[in-house]
């Protein structure tokens, strides 16, 4: 447990000793005279010379892409519990900001998110799950800041080009409709809007976007640019007065706690508008704790936003478990409140947007950092971190070596804080299980002597919050159900008359968009189906495949039988597939291997070892046309695979040596309309 040492009056020492007997299970806190303390650094916290920059909050990203995909399928009460740990004030991560992807139909890291406008004359503000997530966040914290940012765009905006700036007015219109729709259909006020995630910005587009926002009465919506690097946008703003005027926040990604001179010269708010992206182990928590402090200490960034909010996607997709917490098993209800949640709480539960950093923040003498914030009404929060190099490496950028060692740190409260009588203390220690504590409340610290100082003994990988606020809480629920594998028998007939979400449970679209569909041409068995709805390639953010594909199941499945009814809508050139042992997804989807069983409207079939269709195991002619339902069956057992069409054998015992395991999948030959029904898988590992 932490040893933190206080220079205090005799009255406080007596109080501490008498209280110790009744404090079983709480922190052991020895209090010593100043004269007995080991030498160490002294740090003054003072507002006499004014305050630093305004604090804008700590948040996280849902999307970029499909990172919350499995969350929506969780049964209650577990889904609500997960949301409470993320958003409920004074309970868990208690986030101030939620940033969501404006779905654009393209692959954006771990899947695709649907656009509200698949086609030029199409508008639907109930697709996907980001609307729902924003409402759930607002339900828990009405003051939460909402941000929207596009990663990809629907293809029609590009007019044949893979570029969103072909028609600046049209792209601005598309983005503004999303903001207007959020308010009209969901009563959500979007606070900030971004440009194009980690891709090129267009200065004229930003200016047009501002004008169009104003024309719709959306003057309150502020613009963040450019969600990439500091350099280009900052330099451009210094040279372009109109651009300078319309950009409210300069947002950089993975800045390594540093900003650049041009960004600071603008005087604009500086944000780390995407950061973290690290496995949510204790090392990830150390990364998060270090950058939450040092983004301001080193770079004057007043907001830090984590990618991603919750690791709610299949773990074997890229960046598995790189969320603040993990919720990737809706079939079992199991979830894990990971240590980054409690590291977040050290800042989020004891500050609010609109507070101000003190000017007196900085680095500790023997490693680590400290920040202090105030609401200007007498409240003070101090956050101290001593994260070691070994246990605080983020996924990027490269972290130069630094050393952290045991030290004594004396903090002196001056200015309006000199008369503060008491500070609440919250503590985290990362590392060995026997020494590990997460967001533990310690005995409060009384400051009864006249100089308002206290001394802490700090060791590596620790996090302290000392605050005048008494509202902190480590929320908890009964443990969720135990972890379970994806069911080895899984069926979905897609018979949902009024679906709450547009996507079927557990299917994770990797290229294309698969939605519940009411087939008015078939009032019978196939009245309700799952349909691939994109008819052109989106303006991509990643390397989307040339085929559409949605994965499902357990990545460790080896032997399985997949059966599905399929319906090709495109004559002559159309085609569909079912697949097993699919070994890649996300931004790697183009190179996915597996066993793919295709049929085509031109009367042919094919069996391939990859999604791209380069590895051909078998091919031939078959009686297949468009606009007819067929049943495909794919059986994979050991080193061999077989396929059936309408329950009749079409090909048998084809050798398949690689891959050994992977997901099940459905998809289409190109960006084309097609339907799927009565999906059924039987699997063994």
Swiss-Prot record:
Catalytic function, reaction form: a beta-D-galactosyl-(1<->1')-N-acylsphing-4-enine + H2O = an N-acylsphing-4-enine + D-galactose; beta-D-galactosyl-(1<->1)-sphing-4-enine + H2O = sphing-4-enine + D-galactose; a D-galactosylceramide + H2O = an N-acyl-sphingoid base + D-galactose
One Pfam family, short name: Glyco_hydro_59
Record: residues binding substrate: 109, 151, 197, 396
Keyword set, alphabetical order: Disulfide bond, Glycoprotein, Glycosidase, Hydrolase, Lipid degradation, Lipid metabolism, Lysosome, Signal, Sphingolipid metabolism
Intrachain disulfide bonds: 287-394
Residues carrying a glycan: 143, 379, 403, 451, 556, 559, 602
Compartment(s) where it occurs, according to its Swiss-Prot or TrEMBL record: Lysosome
Active site: 198 (proton donor/acceptor), 274 (nucleophile)
Domain of life of the organism encoding this protein: Eukaryota
Segments crossing the lipid bilayer: none
GO cellular component terms listed in the entry, alphabetical order: lysosome; membrane
Record-linked InterPro entries: Aldolase_TIM, GH59_C, GH59_cat, Glyco_hydro_59, Glyco_hydro_59_dom, Glycoside_hydrolase_SF
Residues of the signal peptide: 1-42
Function field: Hydrolyzes the galactose ester bonds of glycolipids such as galactosylceramide and galactosylsphingosine. Enzyme with very low activity responsible for the lysosomal catabolism of galactosylceramide, a major lipid in myelin, kidney and epithelial cells of small intestine and colon.
Annotated family: Belongs to the glycosyl hydrolase 59 family.
Disease: Defects in GALC are the cause of globoid cell leukodystrophy (GLD); also known as Krabbe disease. This deficiency results in the insufficient catabolism of several galactolipids that are important in the production of normal myelin.
Protein name in UniProt: Galactocerebrosidase
Species this protein is from: Macaca mulatta (Rhesus macaque)
